[in-house]
Amino acid sequence: MKPILLQGHERSITQIKYNREGDLLFTVAKDPIVNVWYSVNGERLGTYMGHTGAVWCVDADWDTKHVLTGSADNSCRLWDCETGKQLALLKTNSAVRTCGFDFGGNIIMFSTDKQMGYQCFVSFFDLRDPSQIDSNEPYMKIPCNDSKITSAVWGPLGECIIAGHESGELNQYSAKSGEVLVNVKEHSRQINDIQLSRDMTMFVTASKDNTAKLFDSTSLEHQKTFRTERPVNSAALSPNYDHVVLGGGQEAMDVTTTSTRIGKFEARFFHLAFEEEFGRVKGHFGPINSVAFHPDGKSYSSGGEDGYVRIHYFDPQYFEFEFEA
């Protein structure tokens, strides 16, 4: 498996995301640049210029018309995907940590950090109502008093959002009323990443407590646990197979004090049902911060602390592989 190396960032990668068809790959890092690449050959299609701080999150809508980014420059920005033009600038009081389009692409949500005396909020804007954008007034704002949100995604059919907190809690918030519908605490430490399955019936969480866990997306019932020896920064579910890929490594601050072999910087593949690890992919120099499966399941990408993104196309052996129970 020879990876395609994407070199477009000067700082460590914070998130990578495919669009729905998987022909484009969006990457953001702790620099102000938002890059978009052709996933088939790793050619850079363009950049979205405008942010002035680290970019924490990126999302593309269903038909890849618009791109949404959230940054530490205290803004969430909406872009025209094709032209790179900035369509909206939503100012916030603190850094924007997570952002996302709902299934229809009409409503956006983003969450802000608890910092500088400001509370953590989840804001909802309806893009069909220009007055909300112009006045920077969301139609709904949910305060999070206890523990800040560290990752969030839209639930099935855009009826709720699923948010992971610094404390390890998972909350399901209604997108209509803002109330907490379900609350569970299966992780003991911060939830770094949440990714849904292709059919949105379940999702996988990646946590600092060295595990990734599988949950039902409506009841938030805990199904499976994938254990490692290192904090897990990101986890993604295969759209075709019962496989989950985990990316992680140590905390960035411990990296220089150990050799790479001890750091365990491989991407690790687990079987979804048996919770057994069956493969590893080396490559990154430093921890992996974000992983994503291509929507056709034939490749996956990872973005690391080293600032590189690697696109891996699976060998034929991967597709013939049968797991012996």
Swiss-Prot record:
It comes from Rattus norvegicus (Rat). One of its GO terms (cellular component) is synapse. The modification N6-acetyllysine is found at K264. It comes from the Eukaryota. Belongs to the eIF-3 subunit I family. There is a cross-link at K282 (Glycyl lysine isopeptide (Lys-Gly) (interchain with G-Cter in ubiquitin)). InterPro entries: eIF3i, WD40/YVTN_repeat-like_dom_sf, WD40_repeat_CS, WD40_repeat_dom_sf, WD40_rpt. WD repeats lie at residues 8-47, 50-91, 144-183, 186-225, 283-324. Transmembrane segments: none annotated. HAMAP family: eIF3i. Gene3D superfamilies: YVTN repeat-like/Quinoprotein amine dehydrogenase. Phosphorylated by TGF-beta type II receptor. This is Eukaryotic translation initiation factor 3 subunit I. It is found in: Cytoplasm. GO terms for biological process: cytoplasmic translational initiation; formation of cytoplasmic translation initiation complex; translational initiation. SUPFAM superfamilies: WD40 repeat-like (SSF50978). Keywords: Acetylation, Cytoplasm, Initiation factor, Isopeptide bond, Phosphoprotein, Protein biosynthesis, Repeat, Ubl conjugation, WD repeat. PROSITE patterns: WD_REPEATS_1, WD_REPEATS_2, WD_REPEATS_REGION. Component of the eukaryotic translation initiation factor 3 (eIF-3) complex, which is composed of 13 subunits: EIF3A, EIF3B, EIF3C, EIF3D, EIF3E, EIF3F, EIF3G, EIF3H, EIF3I, EIF3J, EIF3K, EIF3L and EIF3M. The eIF-3 complex appears to include 3 stable modules: module A is composed of EIF3A, EIF3B, EIF3G and EIF3I; module B is composed of EIF3F, EIF3H, and EIF3M; and module C is composed of EIF3C, EIF3D, EIF3E, EIF3K and EIF3L. EIF3C of module C binds EIF3B of module A and EIF3H of module B, thereby linking the three modules. EIF3J is a labile subunit that binds to the eIF-3 complex via EIF3B. GO terms for molecular function: RNA binding; translation initiation factor activity. Component of the eukaryotic translation initiation factor 3 (eIF-3) complex, which is required for several steps in the initiation of protein synthesis. The eIF-3 complex associates with the 40S ribosome and facilitates the recruitment of eIF-1, eIF-1A, eIF-2:GTP:methionyl-tRNAi and eIF-5 to form the 43S pre-initiation complex (43S PIC). The eIF-3 complex stimulates mRNA recruitment to the 43S PIC and scanning of the mRNA for AUG recognition. The modification Phosphotyrosine is found at Y308.
